[in-house]
Amino acid sequence: MSKAVVFGSFVVDLMARSPHLPVPGETVKGSYFKMGPGGKGFNQCVAAHKAGADVVMVTKLGKDTFGKVATDTMDSLNMPKEHLLFSDTEDTGIALILVDENTAQNEIIIVPCALNTIT
């Protein structure tokens, strides 16, 4: 079995679709919302795990609801959690993702939070 260590981000994705992306100052009514686990590092870790690799994730989470999303997701996939780091002062990172449902164009804002404190 292949072995891998992924040192990267876990964020909770907050994704909304709308008929078009807002221009500055505009409010747009959305048509769909989904919240779920994400982050480039976490997505790579899950892909390697599902491909059969013995993989561990090194990332930093907050001790908050979104940190629980990370640990619950890893539990559901039977992924090890012993290398997760936790911040006492910062929240788990998030990604705000806006998607135009007609063109699939997106705009993403990443708020790293606890990820900024990895040392």
Model-based region annotation:
Residues 1-60, 67-69:
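Glycine-rich phosphate/adenosyl-contacting loop at the front of the ribokinase-like
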Residues 26, 35, 50-119:
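Conserved N-terminal subdomain of the carbohydrate kinase-like
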